[in-house]
Each structure stands twice: as structure tokens, then as C-alpha cells.
Regions:
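Conserved PLP-enzyme active-site core in the AAT-like
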Residues: 1-174, 179
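PLP-dependent enzyme catalytic core of the Aspartate aminotransferase-like
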Residues: 4, 13, 22-24, 36, ...
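Short phosphate-engaging motifs
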Residues: 8, 121, 165, 210-214, ...
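Glycine-rich beta-alpha junction loops
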Residues: 80, 102, 150, 165, ...
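Residue-level signal for pocket-adjacent positions within structured domains
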Residues: 98-99, 131, 146, 226-233, ...
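Short, flexible turn/loop "capping" segments at secondary-structure junctions
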Residues: 106, 138, 195-198, 256-261
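Short, well-ordered beta-strand elements within core beta-sheets of diverse protein domains
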Residues: 144-153, 200-209, 265-269
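Conserved small-domain helix->loop->beta segment predominantly found in fold-type I
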Residues: 163-234, 249-255
Length: 287
């Protein structure tokens, strides 16, 4: 799919062609297009659900069925959902990825990644990792293990707060649109309700004054939310996708992914929910 995390999109659109790997990018929400491309023949289907930053939702089980009929491997980036809220392997996916730097670690102090899935595939990946040296250093491993002890507690709080914040923002006169799978207005709400146990701590919203200038006025006014590229930590972070997640993409590429210049990504922390809502209220008062 084309509306993935910015770094992933650059790998697909720029790097893989150098290795003679053909890539077809599809709209996450256009399941008919994805199934049509799969039917033409492919080796791997890469999905992200919910997507970064617009939280689009993919019907994982449906696309897994289509991919397996074409004998393709299905890989799902589950970073936004976390294992607490969604388990793509139980929906038939072959491999699942997590940026452990985000929710798994939860404290914005360790870099790491996780891949899990079918043993035969993992064995191949493990062998490749032995050769290229992509090994987690001991301190990062310790910090991630420490962070995962509180994963369930953190995610439950982030789920609850994000739902309340999204509901508040949806009614605010300065907000044009809120993107959060937990809202009934979200295009993927029905699918998310079926395949997710919780809707996650990530949301994004578009200012009615849809411009990057408006974003630059708004973000510095936040007191609790830190302007940062990271997400999934105990601290709330905020920022426009133009700077953290999709800085590698041009404005035209972001627009093609459905990411407007007035969009703001919000990673809900574990602070008091009322404090976070009050913080948004005072920051939005300039509009």
C-alpha cells in the first residue's frame, strides 16, 4: 500500500527498484484495487494498519485470503496497533513488524525493531541478520524488556485517553476532521471494531485552517504535548507529518497519500486525560 509510514514508502518507491524488485503501490482503502493487483501475481503483500499518520484501516483477513490464493507472503506493520490491540498473525498474516522504539519500549529511550511470524520465514531472516549484523545492543534490549513489563497498562490508558480526545476534537469548531478508528465517523471503524480489541493511542486531526502556517502557530502553544518525531511513549507527542513521519516525501507525495498540510499527528501519552484535553483547548483558542 502507498499510504504507509514515510520511510517505508521511500524504500518501496525508490530503493527496491535498484534491486530489480517491481513494486505496485495501492490505496490502503481501495481493497478492490489491491485484490486486483494481487490477482495479477505477486510474491509479497505489505500492509500497515492503522496507517501512519491518517489511521486508515485495512481488512487484514480479506487481503490475506486474496494474497494466499496468489501464493504471496503477507507482511503487516502493526506498530500503531501494538500486540495488545491487534494480532495480525491470528488473522492469517505470515509476518508482523513492530518498531519497538515506539509503543513496545514506551519510553523513547531505545531503538529497536521486532519481526515475528512463521518459523520457516523467521529462520531465513535470522540467517540474513547474522550476516548483515543487525543485532540489538544489550542496553537497548534491557530497556525494551523493561518497557514491555508495563505495555498492557500503558496501552489501556492510551486507548482510553485517545478515544476521549478524538471525541473532543471532533466537536471543536477549529477542527475540520479527526482521524481515529474508534470514532463511528471513521471510514474504517467497522473493520477496526472487528479486528482490533482497542483503537490505539494514535490519532491525527486536520485544522480547519488547512495550512502549514496554521500548524506552526498551533504546535508551539502545546504545554503537555512535546513536539517530537517519536510516538508511542508515556509522554504525549505532537507534530505535522511533514516533519516527523513523512519528511522524506515532497508535499505532492504527501498529498497523493491523503496527507494535507494542515494535518497534525497526535501520540497520546499516559498523562491525565483532562489535562491533555485542557491543553488542546488552550492551544486551539487562537483560531
Amino acid at each position: 500500500v502507498k499510504d504507509t509510514y514515510g520511510g517505508t514508502n521511500v524504500i518501496f518507491s525508490e530503493f527496491l527498484h535498484r534491486f530489480n524488485i517491481d513494486v505496485t503501490l495501492c490505496d490502503t482503502t481501495d481493497h478492490a484495487q489491491i485484490e486486483s493487483e494481487i490477482a495479477k501475481g505477486c510474491d509479497l503483500v505489505y500492509l500497515e494498519s492503522p496507517t501512519n499518520p491518517t489511521t486508515k484501516v485495512v481488512n487484514i483477513a480479506t487481503l490475506v485470503h486474496a494474497a494466499h490464493q496468489a501464493h504471496a507472503v503477507v507482511v503487516v506493520d502493526n506498530t500503531f496497533a501494538t500486540p495488545i490491540n491487534q494480532n495480525p498473525l491470528s488473522l492469517g498474516a505470515d509476518l508482523v513488524l513492530h518498531s519497538a522504539t515506539k509503543f513496545l519500549g514506551g519510553h523513547a529511550d531505545a531503538l529497536g525493531g521486532v519481526i515475528c511470524g512463521q518459523k520457516a520465514l523467521i529462520d531465513q531472516i535470522y540467517h540474513y541478520r547474522e550476516i548483515n549484523g543487525a543485532t540489538l545492543h544489550p542496553m537497548a534490549a534491557y530497556l525494551l524488556l523493561r518497557g514491555m513489563k508495563t505495555l498492557d497498562l500503558r496501552i489501556r490508558q492510551q486507548n482510553e485517553s485517545a478515544m476521549k480526545i478524538a471525541s473532543y476534537l471532533e466537536k471543536h469548531p477549529a477542527i475540520e476532521q479527526v482521524f481515529y478508528p474508534g470514532l463511528s465517523s471513521h471510514s474504517g471503524h467497522e473493520i477496526a471494531s472487528e479486528q482490533m480489541r482497542g483503537f490505539g493511542g494514535m490519532l491525527s486531526f486536520m485544522l480547519k485552517e488547512n495550512s502549514f502556517d496554521a500548524v506552526r502557530q498551533f504546535v508551539p502553544r502545546m504545554k503537555f504535548a512535546h513536539a517530537a518525531a517519536n510516538l508511542g511513549a508515556v509522554e504525549t507527542t505532537i507534530g505535522p507529518p511533514a516533519t516527523p513521519s513523512h519528511v522524506e516525501c515532497t508535499p505532492e507525495q504527501r498529498a497523493a497519500m491523503g496527507i494535507p498540510e494542515g494535518l497534525i499527528r497526535y501520540s497520546t501519552g499516559i498523562e491525565n486525560t483532562a489535562d491533555l484535553i485542557h491543553d488542546l483547548q488552550q492551544a486551539l483558542s487562537i483560531f
